[in-house]
Amino acid sequence: MDDRDWEVPSVANRSTDSSGQQAAQGTPGHSHQAVLTVLPASGATKGVVLVLHGGKSRSREPVEARHLSPARMIPFARQLHRAGGRSGLAVWSLRNSVRGWNGPDMSPLRDARWALAQITERHPGVPIYLLGHSMGGLTAVCAADHPQVEAVVALAPWLSPETPATGVAGRKVLIVHGTVDHWTSAAQSLAFARRASRSAASMQYVTLNGAGHFMLRKLRLWQGLATGFVLSAFNESTRAGAPVPRSYAQLLPESAVQVTL
């Protein structure tokens, strides 16, 4: 999680304005709104990345742009857009309505499902790739059952034995976790990867030695792995020919299942 608040998680249709932002209906129980920021593809949209940020176990406080959790994902979104935008890859970033997972309410998952509905309305049939950090990684895993989702990247995800693996069935999955993460459990991420590998289309797990939860150390590795994985999946689905960083194949060979960097 992105704040020191830990527990095992329970597992409107509006047009986009000129700023690329779009407001969702508030999550049930409060009036706060989720916001989507869109970096559009050049030309026809052939695929969409949905970027999901972290948060807290319980909080009804609204998420603001100044909060570190959504701000942390901006460089990832921009790098993906720089690398894939000209090839038809759009990048949508979701700012959740509230900061907490909130037990059975699963507030971020509600927001993510709303965002996926907006994407599919505008781009029916295109492949969708989910990229999430911390609580956003949990959200990505749970939202992956959407029929247009083809791949999931979960960075330092907040997973537990109760996290269902059914959502990633038939999906390509990359999980990355640091060895000195004191906020979420690398052991639980690895355990989930092993469980989910039985049904996922592919499962790759990367351990980053000396990296913590907030991706401050080895940032280029975090970004390179996420960008390379998404672009590789995008190219495989669409034959778009987006340029994959040369270093990606060295970091994570296609045949690799578990890698330590």
Task: Mark where each language-model region is.
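Short alpha-helix in the alpha/beta-hydrolase fold that links the catalytic acid
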Residues: 64, 185-195
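C-terminal catalytic histidine-bearing segment of alpha/beta-hydrolase fold enzymes
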Residues: 17, 26, 197, 202-261
